[in-house]
Amino acid sequence: MAASAVAVAFVVAVAAVLAAAASAAVTYDRKAVVVNGQRRILISGSIHYPRSTPEMWPDLIEKAKDGGLDVVQTYVFWNGHEPSPGQYYFEGRYDLVHFIKLVKQAGLYVNLRIGPYVCAEWNFGGFPVWLKYVPGISFRTDNEPFKAEMQKFTTKIVEMMKSEGLFEWQGGPIILSQIENEFGPLEWDQGEPAKAYASWAANMAVALNTSVPWIMCKEDDAPDPIINTCNGFYCDWFSPNKPHKPTMWTEAWTAWYTGFGIPVPHRPVEDLAYGVAKFIQKGGSFVNYYMYHGGTNFGRTAGGPFIATSYDYDAPIDEYGLLREPKWGHLKQLHKAIKLCEPALVAGDPIVTSLGNAQKSSVFRSSTGACAAFLENKDKVSYARVAFNGMHYDLPPWSISILPDCKTTVFNTARVGSQISQMKMEWAGGFAWQSYNEEINSFGEDPLTTVGLLEQINVTRDNTDYLWYTTYVDVAQDEQFLSNGENLKLTVMSAGHALHIFINGQLKGTVYGSVDDPKLTYTGNVKLWAGSNTISCLSIAVGLPNVGEHFETWNAGILGPVTLDGLNEGRRDLTWQKWTYQVGLKGESMSLHSLSGSSTVEWGEPVQKQPLTWYKAFFNAPDGDEPLALDMSSMGKGQIWINGQGIGRYWPGYKASGNCGTCDYRGEYDETKCQTNCGDSSQRWYHVPRSWLSPTGNLLVIFEEWGGDPTGISMVKRSIGSVCADVSEWQPSMKNWHTKDYEKAKVHLQCDNGQKITEIKFASFGTPQGSCGSYTEGGCHAHKSYDIFWKNCVGQERCGVSVVPEIFGGDPCPGTMKRAVVEAICG
């Protein structure tokens, strides 16, 4: 070959490589994120890898894909990966690379939210506590020590992703990355130092050359080329800060977190779907559900303070990895409908037309003839019939219908056709307990004694929830209270979060803060004797705060004053006398939660209702493959370990306050709107990953602070107990799209884990009333309803019945819109 030909061939080859690289690059324009040269409507869901086990990851990711997701979004948890300076950990639940590779294997993309501040109701917002003690540090502002550590960790993660070939241009799944997190409110408060920090963070991130777009959420002045994005229950109001950026929603909140002492939040899927459809209707092109699977705050990872161990979040995939229906199924249908509209959605902006006082249409068209319409009724009470394109459409209140061809309704946000699954927690075994009493006033070889009160985290460095504060009070023989029988009054003021007061070795009182206010004050009558008295206060942290500014200033523990009233002298201030400090429990120092540590002490017969007690039991793994949990309803407050691994904090003794009332999907949602568990424990059941168990000889260890009844603890299996469906004659269907006509609606029921339908508890075709678990017949009822469902469904794992009068022996009430409603038992 001639030299010139070789040169030409080389140039062509290089051009081909460059062209391939260019086509693989991820960019964006004003309409959407552009992947491989194509504008994309991207549906994403948050799954946080440390909140589930590696054994759960493949199934969670597959269920996310089956639910219609394109992207899995996760934070990167700095304190899990760098527990001490320069010492990195990327194994087990923190194997980030393995998690991302599993997402790639499933054919999904990744939005990697490096932060490295994450909030996330995670301990200390994801920051390692050692960061607080870097000299001269001030968090999340224009501070050189903080910026140096942040840049070092961010660079570490980016270089790791590059070395593993995980960015999209390398053939990996990462198409987006996030720097910082929800910084806008802090920037507003701090002013210029915060603005300088935000600009620095953006420039630092871009300089890492990831070749994928960077985003900042809740950061209105994110500098180019960073995309600012929205977080919230609704984001149809949001527009990016520059016209050349796409409209993105990084956190569509599927509900809210659970905290100890507050009701459990739920968000109706009708409202969630409505919020997402409103955002897409506005021109949004990226939606991420926060959370799609919430998981579990294992060990001491929960933040808050007072964040519960469960991070279920009422997500489409529940804490245990099971589908939450109808939320998962209804959103899956929404995603299908949106994807049918994609060619029109990415082509241009909507044309919005009023169809009534609270009704409108948003129509998207492409130059190739694609047309998609969203018909909205934002009235919170009334149904509406609207005229559009020469046809009439019935819209439930607070809903949107999606027409991928501007004619055929395939989905309405308020018409839920997916089944409703009611879960059961089935007893799977009890335990034979032994107990060991935690020693009070048991100091180590070299206890810390100093004048005055010390802040708790400065002493413990968050290596334990527990810190003992002990001081001594001398009482003279001539004190009047000794002879007149009166009590002294002890007052202890603490920054939080919980406190047990012991006088001469006896528990005298317990006090704790709340999600809204972690600070607390103990005031109680105490009996002292002549001579030396011991006052011991066990201060307990319940997760470090995860949101706010100036993390370096946050504190916990007894800061004072501590006073004693009723002495001859009046009030004695104990704040500035000598205090002795013991970090952690004696049982912790002996590793009683482990097999080796638990064998070093003598365990006795179990005691009940005794504070500061360790319990242990051995058990075999229950048969089957259903997810497992511990029912802790008989206990007060403490921590759980299985085979040495931390299940988390438990606190069923903290009852949820408030009045839960009824729930209606219509109208704006907030975290107080649809709640359960008022007057009950915020969390009763605690997830036990099956992968943590051996077939036999598993060690369960519990530390109980308050005093509970361990004989009431049981292992339970989580599975579907019953399934319900409520389907209208005119339920929109994806089949309508294929036939361009309105297909017959159909009821679908399905049990799980090999279960079959064993009984039809209720069935009615007509106008039934009530909700799943409490249905009743209405004024219109087809008498063959029960027989039809029994014949088609009993003995089957899944079944389907068409919602048409002839199936049920004729029309029981002509001219009336009818529904087929059924409840079936799985077993």
Swiss-Prot record:
GO terms for cellular component: apoplast; plant-type cell wall; vacuole. Residues 1-24 form the signal peptide. It is found in: Secreted, Extracellular space, Apoplast. It holds the Pfam family GHD. Its EC number is 3.2.1.23. Coiled coil: none annotated. One of its GO terms (biological process) is galactose catabolic process. It catalyses: Hydrolysis of terminal non-reducing beta-D-galactose residues in beta-D-galactosides. This is Beta-galactosidase 2.
